[in-house]
């Protein structure tokens, strides 16, 4: 038992302690509460995996609740994309809920607090309220409206709700402690006037609850047992508990907030404002650009849900923030793709190769394996003919004994095909090689069982048949930024660190089977890297995104 406890993370330990102290397993309930004002990013994957992972571990329901309390920034488009991302990661929610479902209940509770003398309407501008709060070392200044009669606040609050006042002209504040060293407890704003239509409630409401008020009470309404959030909300916990104490009824589950470290990944930024700027300034093409740290961007790049979940598992649940290496994420992606990606042949820097002693007009279909890592992956047939494309870098006219690819007078095996020998080259007026001429050993066909086929040559290269090849556009993606923490320096614009070579596009040729692969299907371009078909592909233009390079020296600790 002691061994088992050691392997628990600190959140699981809290839950185990609560279960040991009277909470029943049936009372366990979790939630993932995104605000629908943008696309989910790599940082959110940790919160998703923690909450839904606990649901799976304890067989407890997990709600997907949209914290839709700011109609200025929220749209249905973001709701839809968030649902798609959570599903794609492989998680199932119990219910889809919205903070806006509780607007009436939250309003009624606010009225109750006013009646109890625990909230008041303040007519000061927000700038003045901020100024009066002072700083943790200096007590705040009480609002002149703090002790106004309850009836006055009740009347004004109802009129705020009815839309009688301008946006921002009044607010409802909780009456707590203007001398508290915790700034969140210095009479926080509970409601602000905002004459904006809401994506779900339309124009029914003219006032909207602030995050701290809506969040904890929504947890309570849903009877969430453990409200897990990132570390920046740690000093909001006293306010979370104060609000809860005002409405809590004996016999109900009293939700508790606990915090874990945010996940920051090197060479990435996750600030929504900065991501929006990347789009607005045309640095990237949109939220799902494969260079973006959004889940939709990573999916389009070819990252798998399994790889992302494995990454989160390796990162673990910590209490202290640290910078996670992008290489660890790429390691997890590479590890998963090695297992699942179909092996295909694509030449990204093509040069023509003609086998002079192969009969003109002849073609044959050769068997090749789909994935040596999967027993049941099977085989497929690829076309072979007299004229092929190979990689330009796989040939040298002259080379030393350490060059194991094709050279004049040297032999190499064409993968799943024959052994060939470099004979001569043709060049253009600039001295550039345009065509390589070779001969083949017709008895050396791979898998034929002949003595010649078993002959050992030092190199094997990939190729495609020129007659059958399909032209492909290959987008080689790299890091979007040139430094590990592009937004670390407040005085330096993060756009200064944009990598000018974050994407390079080349035209290549691929085996014809790539016509039929689905968008998003994982592929290994043999000897090159892992790729996936992009949504920009058409019936005549096939586009492939590089997901990650084939190898990296990085090994996780």
Positions of PLM-derived features:
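N-terminal catalytic cores of NTP/NDP-binding nucleotidyl/phosphoryl-transfer enzymes
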Residues: 6-83, 199-230
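Core subunits and conserved enzymes of cellular information-processing
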Residues: 233-237, 241-243, 309, 313-316, ...
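Residue-level signal for inorganic ion chemistry
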Residues: 22, 51, 82, 113, ...
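Long, charged, mostly alpha-helical binding arms that flank functional sites
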Residues: 253-332
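Secondary-structure transition/capping motifs at alpha-helix termini
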Residues: 21-25, 53-61, 85-95, 220-221, ...
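Conserved short loop/turn motifs at secondary-structure junctions
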Residues: 33-36, 65-73, 95-104, 127, ...
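Active-site cores that bind ATP or allylic diphosphates and position pyrophosphate for catalysis
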Residues: 68-70, 76, 98, 112-275, ...
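A glycine-rich helix N-cap at a beta->alpha junction
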Residues: 78-104, 109-110, 117-120
């Amino acid at each position: 038992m002691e061994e088992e406890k050691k392997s628990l993370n600190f959140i699981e330990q809290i839950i185990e302690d609560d279960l040991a102290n009277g909470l029943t397993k049936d009372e366990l309930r979790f939630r993932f509460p995104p605000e629908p004002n943008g696309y989910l990013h790599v940082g959110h994957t940790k919160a998703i995996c923690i909450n839904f992972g606990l649901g799976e571990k304890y067989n407890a329901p997990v709600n997907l609740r949209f914290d839709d309390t700011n109609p200025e920034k929220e749209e249905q488009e973001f709701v839809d994309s968030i649902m798609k991302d959570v599903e794609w990661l492989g998680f199932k929610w119990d219910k889809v809920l919205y903070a806006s479902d509780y607007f009436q209940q939250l309003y009624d509770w606010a009225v109750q607090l006013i009646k109890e003398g625990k909230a008041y309407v303040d007519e000061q501008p927000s700038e003045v309220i901020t100024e009066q709060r002072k700083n943790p070392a200096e007590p705040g200044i009480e609002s002149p409206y703090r002790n106004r009669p309850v009836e006055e606040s009740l009347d004004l609050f109802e009129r705020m709700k009815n839309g009688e006042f301008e946006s921002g002209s009044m607010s409802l504040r909780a009456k707590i402690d203007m001398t508290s060293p915790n700034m969140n407890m210095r009479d926080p704003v509970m409601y602000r006037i905002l004459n904006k239509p809401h994506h779900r409630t339309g124009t029914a409401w003219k006032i909207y609850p602030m995050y701290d008020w809506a969040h904890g009470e929504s947890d309570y309404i849903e009877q969430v047992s453990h409200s897990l959030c990132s570390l920046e909300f740690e000093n909001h916990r006293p306010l979370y508990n104060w609000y809860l104490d005002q409405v809590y009824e004996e016999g109900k589950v009293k939700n508790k907030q606990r915090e874990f470290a945010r996940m920051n990944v090197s060479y990435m930024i996750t600030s929504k404002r900065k991501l929006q700027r990347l789009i607005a300034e045309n640095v990237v093409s949109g939220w799902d650009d494969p260079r973006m740290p959004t889940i939709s961007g990573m999916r389009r790049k070819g990252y798998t849900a399994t790889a992302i979940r494995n990454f989160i598992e390796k990162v673990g649940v910590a209490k202290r923030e640290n910078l996670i290496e992008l290489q660890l994420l790429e390691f997890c992606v590479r590890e998963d793709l090695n297992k699942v990606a179909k092996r295909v042949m694509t030449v990204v820097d093509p040069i023509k190769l003609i086998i002079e002693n192969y009969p003109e007009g002849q073609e044959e279909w050769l068997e090749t394996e789909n994935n040596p890592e999967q027993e049941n992956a099977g085989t497929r047939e690829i076309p072979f003919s007299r004229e092929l494309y190979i990689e330009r870098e796989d040939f040298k006219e002259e080379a030393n004994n350490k060059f194991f690819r094709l050279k004049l007078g040297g032999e190499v095996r064409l993968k799943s095909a024959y052994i060939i020998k470099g004979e001569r080259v043709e060049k253009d007026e600039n001295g550039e090689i345009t065509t390589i001429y070779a001969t083949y050993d017709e008895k050396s066909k791979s898998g034929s069982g002949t003595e010649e086929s078993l002959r050992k040559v030092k190199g094997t290269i990939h190729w495609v048949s020129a007659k059958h090849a399909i032209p492909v556009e290959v987008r080689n993606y790299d890091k979007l930024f040139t430094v590990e923490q592009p937004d670390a320096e407040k005085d330096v614009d993060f756009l200064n660190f944009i990598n000018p070579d974050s994407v390079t596009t080349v035209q290549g040729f691929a085996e014809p089977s790539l016509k039929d692969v689905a968008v998003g299907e994982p592929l290994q371009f043999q000897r090159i890297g892992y790729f996936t078909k992009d949504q920009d592909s058409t019936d005549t233009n096939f586009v492939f995104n590089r997901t990650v390079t084939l190898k990296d020296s990085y090994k996780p600790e």
